[in-house]
Each structure stands twice: as C-alpha cells, then as structure tokens.
From Swiss-Prot:
Family (UniProt): Belongs to the UPF0349 family.
NCBIfam families linked: PRK13669.1 (NF010190)
Cross-referenced HAMAP family: UPF0349
Protein name per its UniProtKB record: UPF0349 protein BC_4937
Species for this entry: Bacillus cereus (strain ATCC 14579 / DSM 31 / CCUG 7414 / JCM 2152 / NBRC 15305 / NCIMB 9373 / NCTC 2599 / NRRL B-3711)
Highest taxon listed in the record's lineage: Bacteria
Extent of the signal sequence: none
Amino acid sequence: MIKPLIEFCVGNLASGSQAALEKLEKDPNLDVMEYGCLGYCGICFEGPFALVNGEVVQGATVEELVNNVYEYLDENPMF
C-alpha cells in the first residue's frame, strides 16, 4: 500500500517544525521524510510547512500544521 508522503525541509525543522515531524512520524499510515532543502525558501521563512504528496501545507503553529496535514489528506485522498 502506498502511503501519503510528508516531506520536511531541515531548515524549517530548525525553525520549529521539528515537533510536527515527530508527531507525524508516529503515524504508521504516513511516510515522513526530511531533506536538506526543498526549494521553498520564502515559504520556509514564513513559518512551519511541509509538502504533502508534493503540495505545500502550512500552519501558523506546529499544532496547526499537523491539523492542516491531516485535513489536506482527508480532502485529497490518494485513491
């Protein structure tokens, strides 16, 4: 079974999204990856974000980012 892919930029992890990565890694239904740079420097500077199946998902806080990731997945099922 293909799992949704959640990608984080290491620069954004240092800016606060590390806690979101740790929460999402606990979900066995997700593939969570960390990369050196995802090429979204402007968005990265603004606040917590992740790529969810290649689409940018943001949140004002870590909690909001996690909620927005799950909301995006609910609204955009893979199959």
